[in-house]
Amino acid sequence: TYLPVVDCLPYKKGNDIVEQMKVPAGAVPDSTSIEFMYTKNGKEVRFDQANFPTDFDSTYVYVDRKDIVVKKGNGLVAKIVDFSLQSVHGTDTTAAIFANQKPYVLVFAKEMKGAESWKNQFQSIYKKLQSQNIEVILVTPEADRAAQLFGNINILISDATVIKTAARVTPTYFLMNGSRIVEKVAAPTIDQLFTTLNSK
């Protein structure tokens, strides 16, 4: 499967992910208030932080809380709001990965279902990149399954929705320089990644 010819996403070739995560100048966020829901003596009680009950004690049983927008912001938000790379132990490694001074490849795979169909090609690409001393990192929400399929490779976890936005097909290869996307290809056009890599 090929990537779309025109990439209008914030994860397109040439973009810097860190720059895309910055809130635009002049952005005004929504103003919110927290509404708490408790029960006391079998009755539901709702209040916000400004009207906290004076008799609040252990007889109040927490039910829920909601953020209520009291004043709408101007809608200016970062183009990328939820990108993160986690280790298999849950440590956020995004900044450490982006601090990488050498080119590296992030391979995005939204799911491992059907991975058998691209496993051999991935392993061939992986070996070729390794022979050029290029670090390869598989990014997926399904780290356990990826480890079963691909063995001892570097795996990071990211949310499936984030991956779906960043990479329209599985797998998608990002040649990275720090946090900048130097090249972005799907498997059928992987030669373009090597051409770009070898032209540096």
Where are these regions (language model features)?
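Extracytosolic and intramembrane catalytic regions of membrane-associated proteins
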Residues: 4-200
